[in-house]
């Protein structure tokens, strides 16, 4: 693939028809026994023409034709054919004829021996990707001198290869001037494409490009035919040399040779230079003229074959250029499709990533919303249980409060009874005071009336006993009231333990004050009881001692008066205590009313909580509906995503199919190029073999015809031309490698430009998609955020209420614990 073999030939347009006719006429004049081997010795292989041999003119005409000798051997000397070919040489070429192996031979010429190029054999050649020129240094040096002669006899065309990727060459040649101007154009060689390795690629096909190469060319058979032809030719030459003395045998041998040449020339398909023929019919008298004629005939044949090879080379270079152009277009299409596929793939992956991210976000938000809803449900359940507990506690507190009110009313009635009893006692005490005063008067007036005093003392004793009984009854009543107070205290503690949520600190303080006053009263009652006991003892002592002394009685009366004063003080203190109890009772009633108002407020709060519960349930249902809507939207988005993924898969399949087709086409083109290169190698090998054979034959001809000097000059020229062609081949190889490097650089730059364009377009698409999705879901997210904020605020309010209630309960529990201590 790196080195492309070339077939160096000279592009010739035109046939040397006139010189061929002149040479034939001259040979007929010099040798009356001329033969018609020239018109009949044509190559019958299709798609080729005969090599035109430039005849060597006689000595008397050499001076007139020296200007022709200075020119190159590939110069066309037929003006008629040059004019025909200069019009448009490519239009005169028929590819089907060139590759048709079954085409019959062209017809023979007239008896005079004039042969046209249409009657001559065509040489079939393999494809050559490069159009080259066998340049003549003499022709270039004499270019300005021979312009007029070229206009007369046919212009010499130097057409080189020009394979450019940018444009298709204009192969039509309008005039001889354009052909002359295009001589020095150097065209670039076709490029090798390094994208696909034929050894690695699994798909290898052969494109049927309209030419069946396997049918038209068989390399192995051609080589075998060439070897057989060379051997037969050598045998014939040996046979002719051995029989050169017999003239009759010469004529027969030459006729046999002519027939055999007509049969052999079919195998001379791929030879660029024919074998030199020696004539056995020459006699000793015309041997020199015969050799000159054979040399000229061979030169004409070579000239025609060079011309045909050049034409075929030109056609093949054009075909290879078109194939390279098609291959480059297919490569560019394939690259564009691959870039489009990469773009679609990247867009598809980005869409998948975006949708996955959005789905993940929606799923996380959905999970967070579900967790929040579950928390709200749990909170609502807790609030419901707390509300139920509060309702039950409220009922219990209400019942206990009613019971405590009834107990307070009962205590109030008992207190009124005690007040009445105290008033009666006061009245009794007043009466006693009056009686004591009377007794003092009686004692002072009548000391003799002891018996009366005794009776009065007895009465007093009886009264004291009654008073003691009354005091005992009052003590019993007080004890019962104390028990009732204890019961009330226990009931109050129970109420306080039950009503932990209420703020009863003032009530508890009042109760504590009542308890302290009660304890004081109990102490005082104990003191009174003790005093009563002492008084009883004293009275008994006095009763015992009254008999003895009146003084002691007076002292006792004084003590009784003092005791009466103390009792009055106690009564006044009890009145004060009663007033205090009455004021406390009023405060307790006020507090009870306040508690009732608080209970009503709590009932209102409970109703508000129930309403908030209903509102929360409604919001939960709305959130659940929104969650269902979001799930439905997610399902729709998933369906859309699946549709887009299916579409992308179909596009990927189409792209892969198209890419496979393009790869197949590229592989076919690569294989065609490889086949062309192989054919070029084979043709170059053939050229080398033929050149070697030519050298061998030229040596033989030089040994047989030492008198001919032009053949040696021609050989030297051929050697020089071969060397120049070798240099040109190396130049073409270097140009081919440079062109290949340039195309690779261009392809890399084009790929980078396409990648930059694709990346910019992709970023714009991603930005547009982001904006679209943000605008689509922004309103929904805002609504959900507002709802979440409202719900969080409501929950905070409920938490604050619960925390305040719990603090109140804890304070009540602390107070109860302090009271128990």
Swiss-Prot record:
<keyword id="KW-0137">Centromere</keyword>
<protein>
    <recommendedName>
        <fullName>Kinetochore protein SLK19</fullName>
    </recommendedName>
</protein>
<dbReference type="GO" id="GO:0098653">
    <property type="term" value="P:centromere clustering"/>
</dbReference>
<comment type="function">
    <text>Has a role in spindle assembly and stability. Required to ensure a timely exit form mitosis. Essential to maintain pre-anaphase spindle polarity. Associates to the plus ends of the microtubules at the kinetochore and spindle midzone. A component of the FEAR (CDC14 Early Anaphase Release) network which promotes CDC14 release from the nucleolus during early anaphase. Required for proper chromosome segregation during meiosis I where it prevents premature sister chromatid separation.</text>
</comment>
<keyword id="KW-0159">Chromosome partition</keyword>
<feature type="modified residue" description="Phosphothreonine">
    <location>
        <position position="273"/>
    </location>
</feature>
<feature type="modified residue" description="Phosphothreonine; by CDC28">
    <location>
        <position position="7"/>
    </location>
</feature>
<dbReference type="GO" id="GO:0051321">
    <property type="term" value="P:meiotic cell cycle"/>
</dbReference>
<feature type="modified residue" description="Phosphoserine; by CDC28">
    <location>
        <position position="201"/>
    </location>
</feature>
<feature type="modified residue" description="Phosphoserine">
    <location>
        <position position="216"/>
    </location>
</feature>
<keyword id="KW-0498">Mitosis</keyword>
<feature type="site" description="Cleavage; by ESP1">
    <location>
        <begin position="77"/>
        <end position="78"/>
    </location>
</feature>
<feature type="region of interest" description="Disordered">
    <location>
        <begin position="699"/>
        <end position="720"/>
    </location>
</feature>
<keyword id="KW-0493">Microtubule</keyword>
<dbReference type="GO" id="GO:0031536">
    <property type="term" value="P:positive regulation of exit from mitosis"/>
</dbReference>
<feature type="compositionally biased region" description="Polar residues">
    <location>
        <begin position="15"/>
        <end position="51"/>
    </location>
</feature>
<dbReference type="GO" id="GO:0071459">
    <property type="term" value="P:protein localization to chromosome, centromeric region"/>
</dbReference>
<keyword id="KW-0995">Kinetochore</keyword>
<keyword id="KW-0206">Cytoskeleton</keyword>
<feature type="modified residue" description="Phosphoserine">
    <location>
        <position position="188"/>
    </location>
</feature>
<keyword id="KW-0132">Cell division</keyword>
<dbReference type="GO" id="GO:0005874">
    <property type="term" value="C:microtubule"/>
</dbReference>
<feature type="region of interest" description="Disordered">
    <location>
        <begin position="99"/>
        <end position="153"/>
    </location>
</feature>
<feature type="compositionally biased region" description="Basic and acidic residues">
    <location>
        <begin position="99"/>
        <end position="122"/>
    </location>
</feature>
<dbReference type="GO" id="GO:0051233">
    <property type="term" value="C:spindle midzone"/>
</dbReference>
<keyword id="KW-0469">Meiosis</keyword>
<feature type="modified residue" description="Phosphoserine">
    <location>
        <position position="283"/>
    </location>
</feature>
<dbReference type="GO" id="GO:0007052">
    <property type="term" value="P:mitotic spindle organization"/>
</dbReference>
<dbReference type="InterPro" id="IPR024312">
    <property type="entry name" value="TACC_fungi"/>
</dbReference>
<feature type="region of interest" description="Disordered">
    <location>
        <begin position="1"/>
        <end position="52"/>
    </location>
</feature>
<feature type="coiled-coil region">
    <location>
        <begin position="310"/>
        <end position="821"/>
    </location>
</feature>
<dbReference type="GO" id="GO:0005816">
    <property type="term" value="C:spindle pole body"/>
</dbReference>
<keyword id="KW-0131">Cell cycle</keyword>
<dbReference type="GO" id="GO:0005819">
    <property type="term" value="C:spindle"/>
</dbReference>
<feature type="region of interest" description="Disordered">
    <location>
        <begin position="274"/>
        <end position="298"/>
    </location>
</feature>
<dbReference type="Pfam" id="PF12709">
    <property type="entry name" value="Fungal_TACC"/>
</dbReference>
<dbReference type="GO" id="GO:0005737">
    <property type="term" value="C:cytoplasm"/>
</dbReference>
<feature type="compositionally biased region" description="Basic and acidic residues">
    <location>
        <begin position="136"/>
        <end position="153"/>
    </location>
</feature>
<dbReference type="GO" id="GO:0000776">
    <property type="term" value="C:kinetochore"/>
</dbReference>
<feature type="modified residue" description="Phosphoserine">
    <location>
        <position position="189"/>
    </location>
</feature>
<dbReference type="GO" id="GO:0007059">
    <property type="term" value="P:chromosome segregation"/>
</dbReference>
<dbReference type="GO" id="GO:0051301">
    <property type="term" value="P:cell division"/>
</dbReference>
């Amino acid at each position: 693939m790196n080195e492309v073999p070339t077939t160096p030939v000279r592009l010739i347009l035109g046939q040397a028809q006139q010189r061929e006719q002149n040479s034939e006429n001259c040979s007929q004049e010099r040798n009356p026994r001329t033969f018609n081997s020239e018109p009949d010795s044509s190559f019958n292989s299709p798609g080729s023409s005969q090599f035109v041999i430039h005849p060597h003119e006689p000595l008397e005409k050499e001076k007139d034709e020296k200007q022709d000798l200075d020119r190159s051997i590939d110069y066309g000397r037929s003006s008629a054919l040059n004019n025909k070919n200069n019009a448009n040489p490519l239009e005169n070429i028929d590819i089907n004829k060139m590759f048709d192996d079954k085409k019959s031979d062209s017809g023979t010429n007239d008896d005079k021996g004039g042969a046209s190029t249409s009657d001559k054999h065509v040489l079939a050649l393999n494809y050559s990707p490069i159009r080259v020129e066998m340049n003549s240094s003499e022709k270039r040096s004499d270019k300005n001198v021979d312009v007029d002669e070229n206009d007369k006899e046919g212009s010499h065309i130097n057409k080189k290869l020009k394979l450019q990727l940018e444009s298709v060459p204009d192969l039509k040649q309008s005039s001889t001037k354009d052909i002359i101007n295009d001589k020095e154009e150097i065209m670039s060689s076709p490029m090798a494409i390094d994208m696909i390795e034929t050894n690695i690629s699994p798909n290898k096909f052969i494109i049927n490009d309209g030419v069946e190469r396997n049918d038209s060319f068989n390399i192995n058979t051609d080589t075998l035919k060439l070897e057989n032809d060379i051997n037969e030719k050598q045998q014939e030459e040996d046979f002719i040399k051995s029989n050169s003395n017999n003239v009759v045998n010469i004529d027969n041998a030459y006729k046999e040779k002519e027939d055999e040449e007509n049969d052999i020339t079919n195998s001379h398909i791929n030879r660029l230079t024919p074998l030199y023929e020696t004539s056995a019919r020459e006699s000793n008298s015309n041997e020199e003229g015969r050799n000159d004629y054979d040399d000229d005939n061979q030169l004409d044949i070579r000239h025609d074959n060079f011309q045909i090879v050049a034409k075929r080379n030109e056609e093949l270079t054009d075909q290879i250029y078109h194939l390279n152009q098609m291959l480059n277009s297919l490569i560019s299409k394939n690259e564009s499709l691959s870039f489009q596929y990469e773009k679609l793939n990247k867009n598809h992956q980005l869409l998948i990533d975006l949708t996955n991210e959005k789905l993940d976000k929606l799923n996380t938000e959905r999970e967070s919303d579900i967790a929040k809803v579950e928390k709200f449900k749990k909170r609502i359940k807790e609030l419901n249980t707390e509300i139920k507990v509060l309702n039950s506690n409220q009922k219990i507190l209400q019942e206990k409060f009613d019971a405590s009110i009834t107990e307070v009313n009962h205590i109030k009635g008992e207190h009124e009874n005690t007040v009445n009893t105290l008033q009666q006692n006061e009245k009794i005490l007043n009466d006693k005071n009056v009686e004591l005063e009377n007794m003092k008067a009686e004692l002072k007036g009548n000391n003799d009336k002891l018996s009366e005093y005794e009776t009065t003392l007895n009465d007093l004793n009886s009264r004291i006993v009654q008073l003691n009984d009354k005091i005992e009854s009052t003590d019993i009543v007080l004890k019962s009231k104390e028990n009732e107070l204890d019961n009330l205290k226990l009931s109050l503690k129970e109420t306080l333990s039950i009503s932990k949520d209420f703020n009863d600190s003032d009530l508890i303080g009042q109760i504590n004050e009542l308890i302290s006053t009660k304890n004081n009263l109990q102490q005082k009652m104990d003191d009174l009881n003790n005093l009563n006991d002492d008084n009883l003892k004293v009275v008994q002592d006095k009763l015992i001692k009254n008999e003895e002394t009146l003084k002691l009685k007076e002292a006792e009366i004084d003590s009784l008066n003092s005791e009466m004063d103390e009792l009055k003080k106690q009564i006044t203190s009890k009145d004060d205590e009663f007033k205090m109890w009455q004021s406390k009772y009023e405060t307790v009633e006020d507090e009870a009313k306040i508690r009732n108002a608080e209970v009503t407020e709590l009932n209102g709060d409970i109703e508000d909580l129930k309403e908030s519960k209903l509102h929360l349930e409604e919001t939960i249902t709305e959130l659940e509906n929104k969650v269902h809507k979001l799930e439905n939207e997610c399902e729709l988005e998933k369906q859309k995503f699946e549709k887009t993924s299916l579409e992308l898969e179909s596009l990927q399949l189409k792209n892969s199919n198209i890419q496979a087709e393009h790869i197949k086409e590229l592989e076919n083109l690569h294989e065609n190029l490889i086949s062309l290169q192989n054919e070029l190698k084979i043709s170059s090998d053939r050229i080398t073999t033929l050149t070697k054979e030519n050298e061998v034959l030229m040596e033989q001809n030089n040994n047989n015809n030492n008198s001919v000097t032009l053949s040696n000059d021609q050989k030297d020229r051929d050697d020089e031309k071969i060397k120049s062609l070798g240099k040109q081949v190396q130049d073409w190889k270097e140009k081919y490698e440079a062109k290949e490097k340039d195309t690779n650089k261009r392809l890399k730059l084009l790929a980078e430009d396409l990648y930059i364009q694709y990346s910019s377009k992709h970023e714009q698409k991603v930005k547009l998609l982001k904006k679209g999705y943000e605008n689509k879901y922004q309103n929904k997210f805002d609504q959900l955020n507002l709802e979440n904020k409202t719900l969080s605020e409501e929950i905070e309010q409920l938490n604050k209420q619960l925390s305040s209630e719990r603090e109140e309960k804890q304070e009540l529990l602390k107070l109860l614990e302090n009271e128990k201590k």
